[in-house]
Amino acid sequence: MDNLQNVLKIGLPKGSLQDSTLELFANAGFHFSVQSRSYFPSIEDDELEAILIRAQEMAHYVELGAFDVGLTGKDWIIETDADVVEVADLVYSKASMRPVRWVLAVPESSAIKSVKDLEGKHIATEVVNITKKYLARNGVNASVEFSWGATEVKPPDLADAIVEVTETGSSLRANKLRIVDTILESNTKLIANKASWNDSWKREKIENMAMLLQGAINAQGKVGLKMNAPKAALQNIAAIIPALRQPTISNLADENWVALEVIVSEKTVRKLIPELKRAGAEGIFEYNINKLID
């Protein structure tokens, strides 16, 4: 194949997801460099070209073929009704490693208690199509207006209710808003253009990227532990290790000793290491994990 064809164009989300996305890619082994005010990140991989673009537009441009692959939310795929290949679920967001929610929210003092109370009301949101479908499913007639941002400030003067995205609900609470219902749970997805997915070289490149990105997500909050232990203490040590699988055990030159290696939750380490030491382990050391491939 001609080398000029061996380029994968990737769309990276600009805005709230940008920093967490670039960090995820770095952990997966893809180190993008973004210059101030530039929308074209560089990377030491001649087979990749990247552009920063808003997640809201990503699925549309991937469908058109402007990008071979991109990252955006399930919400924006639904909102734009984009015809793309959903390659992988990547459960991370701007502030956590969990999905976000699109919720129906009203002022704390509002009489609105359920979606049925929205009959004849006015709703502001960025996800107009998702909101209209939600109202239709519930048999409610209400007007839905596109919001360009700062949606939380619109009730009660500019809207009776809003449909807004949240991770923790803290922004809604700060603006004295109450959640009435969760409309949609969304997470980031790696998506591909259909023609690109049918290209064998591009598909392999995309699948490899998906594997490494998922591995980076799997490794979040995990660390590795290595240690030596006398065989006489092995049973007691193995019993207190909350490993993902059974610990890896290797023989040492001294036939009475073995080496153990495990992957554990980082949250357990401060309790676990003293217990391992008391159980007879020696030479314990902890190391970070960038990727964990199942």
Swiss-Prot record:
Gene3D superfamilies from the UniProt entry: 3.30.70.120, Periplasmic binding protein-like II
Pathway membership: Amino-acid biosynthesis; L-histidine biosynthesis; L-histidine from 5-phospho-alpha-D-ribose 1-diphosphate: step 1/9
Family designation: Belongs to the ATP phosphoribosyltransferase family. Long subfamily.
Pfam family, one: HisG
Cofactor(s) required for function per UniProt: Mg(2+)
Compartment annotation: Cytoplasm
Catalytic activity of the protein: 1-(5-phospho-beta-D-ribosyl)-ATP + diphosphate = 5-phospho-alpha-D-ribose 1-diphosphate + ATP
Protein name: ATP phosphoribosyltransferase
GO MF term set: ATP binding; ATP phosphoribosyltransferase activity; magnesium ion binding
InterPro entries documented for this protein: ATP-PRT_HisG_long (IPR020621), ATP_PRibTrfase_cat (IPR013820), ATP_PRibTrfase_HisG (IPR001348), HisG_C (IPR013115), N-reg_PII-like_a/b (IPR011322), N-reg_PII/ATP_PRibTrfase_C (IPR015867)
Activation and inhibition: Feedback inhibited by histidine.
Function of the molecule: Catalyzes the condensation of ATP and 5-phosphoribose 1-diphosphate to form N'-(5'-phosphoribosyl)-ATP (PR-ATP). Has a crucial role in the pathway because the rate of histidine biosynthesis seems to be controlled primarily by regulation of HisG enzymatic activity.
GO BP terms, alphabetized: L-histidine biosynthetic process
EC number: 2.4.2.17
